[in-house]
Amino acid sequence: MVIGRSFGPPALADAIVELPLPGGPNERPITTGFPDKGALILQRTRPPLLETPFEVFDQSVLTPNDQFYVRWHWSVIPTEIDVGSFRLAVRGHVEKSLSLSLDEILALPHVELIAVNQCSGNSRGYFQPRVPGAQWSNGAMGNALWTGVRLRDVLDRAGVKAGAVQVRFNGLDEPVVAEAPDFMKSLDVDHARDGEVMIAYEMNGQQLALLNGFPLRLVVPGWYSTYWVKMLNDIEVLDQPDTNYWMKTAYTIPDTPHASIRPGQTDVKFVPISRMVPRSFITNIKSGDTLRAGVSTLARGIAFGGDAGVSRVEFSSDGGKSWQEAQLGTDEGKYSFRQWQIHFGLPTAGNQLLMVRCTSSSGEAQPDTPNWNSAGFMRNVIEQTAVVVA
């Protein structure tokens, strides 16, 4: 059975959205021209970079599959996959190499987990000075119920040998030219076998969309999506640290608080990016909205603790001078978005800044000032929403 979709850039944009990015361009096309996808912000066509419109996050704690963001590194992506002949290889520093069919994987004990998948460069468009790369707004993220099998169970079938150091993952996408480095990512062997890392075949109760990694994708809860390898077809156990380009050079951050340095600073050690950090957003009020003075107004939104749960969410209606604790919604697990809400009042007319701050269950709070690094990674400053009070 072959499953696939042809895809390419749409002839015309379905609509235009304005993103308040300091470095521009502010106008971006909305497209519905990609397979199994609804309305998404078009960042790039080849490889596909599609951003979730921010209003989607106000609708549910789970991000719908058809509006889940898309990010690929190479443009050579299979447009159809024969599920009958597909195999997942497990090899390297193991007792027995495996070549697993989808039926064999589906026969393993399944697990479910709700987890945020977020691009390392989510919100890169707000970095000042501007840095190269996709100028994402805040929609290069999504939250889904992932269903699959434990990576540990697959590795145990192969038998990881003593002395194993890391486990490397590769997918079906390919570089445009042979000289370019194949996209591969690695986890330390203990992390790979922690029982939470998953090989997923469903998201939100449906098979993975082709552009979100069908038929299999790695799920690494609490870590940035660079590790969530899509169209996973190769697992290699290594007996030495992985030094491939995507681990040693790309996706590295300054080894400093908040991964922050001064523009031009070079006297700093870089390390591979890994765990996510806390973030929170207002989803039902946007900058430029007009609110009524002297009446109770509802603010609501989402928060997540990065690699930990959400301990509390605080809201400020006066630009950070004072803070009130918001009411938290249902706890869907420590790796999930968590909804919050609060009623507040603005007594007088004028301009005001609304702010929201998340503190994780490990005690890590969002910082007051934005970080900066040359890759545009790991933004998690307290976000501000400028409103007019009338």
Language-model-detected regions and their locations in the chain:
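N-terminal export signals
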Residues: 1-15
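Structured, non-membrane catalytic/scaffold regions adjacent to prosthetic-group chemistry
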Residues: 14-390
